[in-house]
Amino acid sequence: MSTGKNAPVTENSRQMSLQACLDECMEALDLFLNNHFNESLDKLRPRSKESMYHALIYATVLEMQAMMTFQQDDIVHAGNTMKSAQEVCQRFRKKSGGLGSRGANDDLSEEQIHAEVCYAECLLHRAALTFLQDENMVSFIKGGIKVRNSYLIYKELHAFIQSDATFKGPNHKHLEGGVSFGIGAFNLTLSLFPARILKLLEFAGFSGDKEFGISQLYTGATSHTLRSMLCALLLLCFYTFLSFILGTGEGEVEEAERLLKPFRLRYPRGAIFLFFAGRAEEIKGNIDEAVALFEDGCKAQQVWKQFHHMCYWELMWCFTFKRYWKMAYFYADLLSQESRWSKAMYVYMKAAYLSMLPDSESRPFGDNEVDLFRQVPTYKQKIAGKSPPTEKFAIRKARRYKASNPVRLPVPVLEMMYMWNGFSMISKQPELTEGMMETLLEAERTLRASPDNEYTVDDTCLIQLLKGLCLKNQGQMQAAEDCFNQVYISEKKLKFDHYLVPNALLEMSLLFIDTGRKEQAIKLLQKAKNNYKVYSMESRTQFRVHAALTKLKADVSDQEEITAL
């Protein structure tokens, strides 16, 4: 190699080095998706201090592990590793400012552009870990600042790669994939948030375009680049989880299955894709098929046991939908013993399943529901300084059992099922709704035969709300509307479960949407949004109200909050 060609050789070496890094990281991700988790980390670790892509992907895999284990040591380790990855990326960035400070003729090298997108991604991941790691509001705000900075870099990157002057190096598809992931993630996520929550997160003035976000993520997921997996996982989470839990409950199972198909062919035993395939079957009401896929997901790998916990959670709900209370209890018990995510929730669900059994039926392992309900508050935990809303809800409901002669919760399993929008899940299979209606009618008969007490009105309204959902599933719209209205007119009589009224208004508005009464639906949604505050699971209800208003293309601004929020 002659001295006169040193400059071109150096530039070519840098490009080859970047390409070699990307190729090796793709191989590591391939191992990861084939359940070879430790081998994936072993391939990434040696270069994680010198290659921005090795550093980023290594830290990302550790982050995924930490979010599944929920072990504080794992979260701290992942956070420190992601911080180190950000420092590695910083070394490759342009020294004098970012993209926005470029002069007209001040071109960035391919390596420097890749460093920008990797740096933005590190910020995003660190923000997520910050929210999990610390228990004070200062850390929460720091996480919000990281998110905002990441957002601004992604916006600059998106504009930059769209410009005609952009140099398209040999690894440009990976750069585009990184930008698609960031822009898609922000647009989709921000579109889900009500305006007042965006304000709390320092995102006032920012908004998300849901359809644009989905299109960006879909492009990224189908482009066979380094970020394909992340784009696909985020879309699958949206299609099979977020659209149910924080949306109006339709789900987008056809899109999920279309996205899954090539990944299922490429990774037929990939535990992650078996899990999402199971979730798709669950949404369709094909419970037996879902159970088989979740069980296959558990059998597919034994290295990351914490991945099994995601399957156990879904198996618990599958058996709930079929009213196999003891089988559902079995998975709640496994979770309570093995998972760190929310022991209070798992113990509450164990107690709830036992309470659904006839008094004459034996209890597994000699457990007693009253004792279990009383244990629930002892397992309280905090994330970002606050207890998770579902855990707070479980603890509040379990308080009833502190009394020496407690008044039983009428249908605690079905109530929690509603919080996870499970009644939408069973709507596709009439026999599942019929079974739940039988359970509710039996609970209603028991309640009417019992002496009145301080919980009677609240328990009656809960049963009315859930009956309304079953009747709606069965196409009995007027009867369903009557049930929801019964809850609404009982508002002033409620003593404890004040969440029932805004949720009854939400469900009635969704019924109105289905029956073509758009204007009435909007009025009810605005009432649910503006007239109620400080009730259980408020954020989740507000997310669902926002989703319904967005669906109707109604005004989703806060209207200066002229009524109490």
Curated annotation (Swiss-Prot):
A Pfam family: Iml2-TPR_39
Start and stop residues of the TPR repeats: 271-304, 461-494, 502-535
Signal peptide (residue range): none
Keywords on record: Repeat, TPR repeat
InterPro entries: Iml2/TPR_39 (IPR019412), TPR-like_helical_dom_sf (IPR011990)
UniProt cross-references to Gene3D superfamilies, sorted A to Z: Tetratricopeptide repeat domain
The UniProt record lists the keyword Signal: no
Assigned protein family: Belongs to the TTC39 family.
Protein name: Tetratricopeptide repeat protein 39A
Native species: Danio rerio (Zebrafish)
